């Protein structure tokens, strides 16, 4: 048996050149121009068909969707609650009354958040009568004014620091928006402290009331200029309190369909936060 002779570099190079282009058969990379044309045509038609099929299925799906109202809304039967400003760590508002730098961010966030609620920003909105639902047929939807004065001591009008410098900090509570939600009753926000005799809790508007005139909400695109109703929670620590640390829990009350208890979601319709005010 003879050993296979090893090809020289020049032989290998010649074979590669012949593979790349064979002048005798006119093949390029082992295929004739006709063969290359057919295979390119096949893949062009194949991937073109896939792209067309994908585009068609997406178009069909988009025809079933409404650009203004979500198609499926049954998974969100009742709204949750959110607080503002958002603290940097969890839901703990920790600051020092004697150091403005520690609560500067809270104050700035509140001012920026409440700018759309100013009289100037709402001059083109509707002054709706209170106490009743504001049903609208469209296609044009009016947005009701929410006067920032309803927040009273937490409006930033009389106290530009929103009570933080006096040990009476304000936190805004808002209910998540759900399109075409209609409360069955008169909703309001109640807040309690888990610790006794440390701080008093005051809500604005009075009794934490959320007026029915802000319902129903018709969606961001249809209900242009909508102002979400707010409830301000002011934590008033006693002047002689040695410990200025309290946990507040707020929840939705006053209606039969806005829930604040759920075995699967313990935060449905409620929110809990802590306020720690150092001297």
Swiss-Prot record:
An example Gene Ontology biological process: potassium ion transmembrane transport
Subcellular location field: Apical cell membrane; Basolateral cell membrane; Melanosome
Pfam families to which the protein is assigned, alphabetical: Na_K-ATPase
GO cellular component, one term: caveola
Membrane-crossing segments per the record: 36-56
Origin: domain of life: Eukaryota
Function: This is the non-catalytic component of the active enzyme, which catalyzes the hydrolysis of ATP coupled with the exchange of Na(+) and K(+) ions across the plasma membrane. The exact function of the beta-3 subunit is not known.
PANTHER family hit by this protein: SODIUM/POTASSIUM-DEPENDENT ATPASE BETA SUBUNIT, SODIUM_POTASSIUM-TRANSPORTING ATPASE SUBUNIT BETA-3
UniProt name for this protein: Sodium/potassium-transporting ATPase subunit beta-3
Organism, scientific name: Rattus norvegicus
């Amino acid at each position: 048996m003879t050993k296979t002779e090893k090809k020289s570099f020049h032989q290998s190079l010649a074979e590669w050149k012949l593979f790349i282009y064979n002048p005798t058969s006119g093949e390029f990379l082992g295929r004739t121009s006709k063969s290359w044309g057919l295979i390119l045509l096949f893949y062009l038609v194949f991937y073109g068909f896939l792209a067309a099929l994908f585009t068609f299925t997406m178009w069909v799906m988009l025809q079933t969707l409404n650009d203004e109202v979500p198609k499926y809304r049954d998974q969100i039967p009742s709204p949750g609650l959110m607080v503002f400003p958002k603290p940097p760590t969890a839901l703990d508002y920790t600051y020092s009354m004697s150091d403005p730098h520690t609560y500067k961010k809270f104050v700035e966030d509140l001012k920026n958040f409440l700018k759309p609620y100013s009289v100037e920003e709402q001059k083109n909105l509707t002054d709706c009568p209170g106490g009743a639902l504001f049903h609208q047929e469209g296609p044009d939807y009016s947005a009701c004014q929410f006067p920032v004065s309803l927040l009273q001591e937490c409006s930033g009008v009389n106290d530009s620091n929103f009570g933080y410098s006096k040990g009476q900090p304000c936190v805004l509570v808002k209910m998540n928006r759900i399109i075409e939600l209609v409360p069955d009753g008169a909703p309001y926000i109640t807040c309690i402290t888990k610790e006794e005799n440390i701080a008093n809790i005051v809500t604005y508007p009075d009794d934490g009331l959320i007026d029915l005139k802000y319902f129903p909400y018709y969606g961001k695109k249809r209900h242009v200029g909508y102002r979400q109703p707010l409830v301000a929670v002011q934590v008033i620590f006693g002047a002689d309190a040695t410990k200025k640390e309290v946990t507040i829990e707020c929840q939705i009350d006053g209606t039969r369909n806005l829930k604040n208890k759920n075995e699967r979601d313990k935060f449905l319709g409620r929110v809990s936060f802590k306020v720690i005010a150092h001297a």
